[in-house]
Amino acid sequence: MNGTANPLLDREEHCLRLGESFEKRPRASFHTIRYDFKPASIDTSCEGELQVGKGDEVTITLPHIPGSTPPMTVFKGNKRPYQKDCVLIINHDTGEYVLEKLSSSIQVKKTRAEGSSKIQARMEQQPARPPQPSQPPPPPPPMPFRAPTKPPAGPKTSPLKDNPSPEPQLDDIKRELRAEVDIIEQMSSSSGSSSSDSESSSGSDDDSSSSAGEDNGPASPPQPSHQQPYNSRPAVANGTSRPQGSSQLMNTLRNDLQLSESGSDSDD
C-alpha cells in the first residue's frame, strides 16, 4: 500500500471480513518482507520486482530516484512458511477491514545492482556512457641475466694426429740422402776400377805390339797424331772426368745431410 496510513484507530466497531487467502483455493497470498538495510534513495512511487527461484530463493529489485547512482538496489534472501500468522489490512478510503492469512516470511540482504527486470530495461533506455580507453598492458618483468653456458667438452684429440711433427719427414730425407750417397760411392768405385783396367789393358797392348815389331822387323813408320789409338785417351778422359763430377755431387749430398742433421738437433 502506497497510501498514507492513519496511525490512530477510532473506537467504533467495524465489520471484519476474511480475505481470499482463507478460501479453499486461495487466489492470493501474502508475505512479510524484512530488509537488513533499505537506502533512502529508493523511489517509493515506482513498482519493484520480486522473483522466487529454486530452493525458496528470493530476489527483490527496487528502483532508485532518477539520477541516483546506482540506479537500483538488489536484495537477496530466503522465504520461510508461516503457520498461524495473519495480517489486518485497513482501507482508510472505504473503511473496510480485511483479515488475510500470511503464507511466508521473507528476509533479504542488500547486494550489488543486477537483474533482468523492468528496471533493467529502464536502465538500458538511458544513454550509454562512452567507453573509457583501455590501458595498455604493463610491460613484462625483465628477465634475469644468465651467463652463457659452456658447450660440453668433446673427446680430446691428440695433437700428433691432427698436426704431425716434421721429424718423420726429416728422417725420410736423411734416408734418401744416405741412399744417394751410397749409390754414388758405388758408382765412383766401379768407375775407378774400370779406368784402371782400361789403362792396364792399353799398356799391355803397347808392350805386345812393341815386342812383335822387334821380332818381325823394323818398326812401322809413325802414324800421324790424329790417328793415335782410340781407347787410350777417351778412357783416361772418362776415368778422370767422371770421378770429379761424382765427388762434387757427393760433397753436395753430404753437406745437405749435415745441414738436415744439424737442423733436427736444433729442433730437439
Swiss-Prot record:
User: Which residues, renumbered to this chain, carry the PTM Phosphoserine?
Assistant: 165
Per UniProt, what is one GO molecular function of this protein?
Answer: transcription elongation factor activity
Residue stretches spanning the membrane: none
Q: Which UniProt key words apply to this protein?
A: Activator, Nucleus, Phosphoprotein, Transcription, Transcription regulation
Pfam families from the UniProt entry:
EAF
Q: Which domain of life is it from?
A: Eukaryota
For this protein, the record's InterPro entries field holds: EAF_fam, Tscrpt_elong_fac_Eaf_N
Which residues fall in a compositionally biased region of kind Pro residues? 128-154
The annotated region (Disordered) lies at 106-268
| Location(s) in or outside the cell | Nucleus speckle; Nucleus, Cajal body
Coiled coil among the record's keywords? no
| Region of interest (Necessary for transactivation activity), residue spans | 182-262
Q: What residue spans carry the Polar residues bias annotation? A: 238-268
What Gene Ontology cellular-component terms does the record carry?
Answer: Cajal body; intercellular bridge; nuclear speck; nucleus; super elongation complex; transcription elongation factor complex
Low complexity composition bias: residue spans: 188-203
Could you tell me where the Basic and acidic residues compositional bias lies? 171-181
Q: Which GO terms describe its biological process?
A: positive regulation of transcription by RNA polymerase II; regulation of transcription elongation by RNA polymerase II; transcription elongation by RNA polymerase II
The text of the family note is: Belongs to the EAF family.
In UniProt terms, what function does this protein have?
Acts as a transcriptional transactivator of ELL and ELL2 elongation activities.
How does the record describe its quaternary structure?
Component of the super elongation complex (SEC), at least composed of EAF1, EAF2, CDK9, MLLT3/AF9, AFF (AFF1 or AFF4), the P-TEFb complex and ELL (ELL, ELL2 or ELL3). Interacts with ELL and ELL2.
**Which PANTHER family does the record associate with it?**
ELL-ASSOCIATED FACTOR 1, ELL-ASSOCIATED FACTOR EAF
Protein's recorded name: ELL-associated factor 1
- Native organism is Mus musculus
